[in-house]
């Protein structure tokens, strides 16, 4: 018996889950269909829990090896799902970071506005909301890397370096913990709001107001006074 809680294909280009429909009509080819379905299921079932069989089936692929043919492994599929959004976000952020780095008077708030605006813009599309809901699932390793001062993506490294410079008066262990707080707050709050929108409940704030709210609370957390005693560090 089919699990009624699981998504089901109802047409070639449509997948229904409860009252919501995943539209695949805009996907130009098999690879894009697999990416969109994977993104959708990863957001709801987890990047490690979503079943490859379900991704193939909901993407309309009878060949059980279709996903493996296009991506090779689950890890590569996860990377492809993230990069389809992240590369566009990086392209929006990089020229703004170029301008910021020419200034001597930038603040943490200035940096956060560059980070937050393109992320929050993803709330306006189903695919973007799924992307935001996936980010916290892969953040465990990133938070560990930040504590060690490690970043991988060039744009992320630039952002972290700029934020770190704004926190220069704080001891290094505290600065690194503040950067973890930044990453956890921005990812979890965006993911939570994306899920809230997907629930169908009317939004409390529109995208612009939510972006301003994020910048307010995260800049306050980053720049909060340090009262940790030296003996505790």
Functional labels for PLM-detected ranges:
Residues 2-45, 54, 58, 76, ...:
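Basic, helix-initiating cap at the start of DNA-binding domains
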Residues 31-36, 71-94, 98:
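An amphipathic alpha-helix adjacent to DNA-recognition modules
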Residues 47-76, 80:
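Helix-turn-helix
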Residues 94-129:
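Hydrophobic alpha-helical connector segments
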Residues 114-125, 134-143, 165:
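Helix-loop "lid/cap" segments that line or gate small-molecule binding pockets
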Residues 129-132, 143-167, 177:
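Amphipathic alpha-helical packing segments from all-alpha helical-bundle domains
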Residues 167-183, 206-209:
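All-alpha amphipathic helical-bundle segments outside canonical DNA-binding/catalytic cores
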């Amino acid at each position: 018996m089919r699990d009624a809680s699981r998504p089901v294909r109802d047409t070639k280009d449509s997948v229904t889950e409860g009252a919501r429909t995943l539209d695949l009509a805009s996907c130009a080819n098999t690879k894009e269909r697999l990416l969109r379905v994977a993104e959708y299921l990863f957001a709801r079932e987890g990047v490690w829990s979503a079943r490859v069989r379900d991704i193939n089936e909901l993407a309309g692929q009878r060949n059980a090896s279709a996903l493996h043919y296009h991506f090779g492994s689950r890890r590569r599929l996860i990377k492809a799902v993230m990069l389809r959004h992240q590369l566009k976000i990086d392209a929006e952020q990089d020229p703004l970071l170029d301008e910021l780095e020419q200034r001597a008077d930038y603040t943490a708030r200035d940096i956060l506005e560059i980070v937050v605006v393109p992320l929050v813009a993803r709330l306006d599309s189903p695919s973007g909301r799924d992307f935001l809901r996936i980010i916290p699932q892969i953040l465990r390793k990133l938070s560990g890397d930040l504590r060690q001062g490690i970043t991988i993506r060039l744009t992320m490294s630039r952002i972290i370096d700029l934020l770190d410079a704004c926190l220069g008066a704080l001891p290094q262990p505290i600065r690194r913990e503040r950067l973890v707080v930044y990453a956890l707050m921005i990812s979890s709050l965006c993911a939570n709001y994306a899920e809230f929108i997907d629930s169908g409940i009317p939004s409390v704030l529109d995208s612009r107001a939510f972006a301003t709210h994020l910048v307010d609370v995260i800049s306050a957390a980053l720049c909060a006074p340090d009262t940790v005693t030296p003996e505790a560090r």
